[in-house]
Amino acid sequence: TTFVAGFVGTSNLLRGQVARTIVGDGGTFTVRPEKIRIADPEARPAGDEIAASGRIRQVVYLGPDTRYHVALDAGGELVVTQQNFATSSMEALAQQGRAVRLIWKRQHNFPVGDGG
C-alpha cells in the first residue's frame, strides 16, 4: 500500500495523470531513489526502462551519497540518490537547475494499492 511504501524508508510515488504520462498506467507506482539514474536530457531509455524528463530542483550532499530532488515535466517530483564514487560536494551542488532525464528499469517500478 502507499502507507507501507512511505513507511519503509524513502520511496517515490507516481500517481494518477503523472503515472499515466510516465508509466502508461493511471495507477499508483513506487520506485526507490537508488534505482533511478540521472542522464542527459536527450538520453533514450532501453526497451526495459522507463524515463521521465525534469529539472534538478534541489541537491543535498550527504557525504557518501547525494540526494537530488527533480521536478518532473509531467508534474510531481522524484528523489534520486546516487553514491559519490568520484563526485565532490561542489560538483554535486553545481547540478541544481540542470535539465535531466531520469531512467530506471521497469522491474523496479512497483504498483501499490491506495489502502492504508
Regions found by a protein language model. Give the residues of each.
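Conserved beta-strand-loop-alpha-helix hinge in the C-terminal portion
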Residues: 1-8
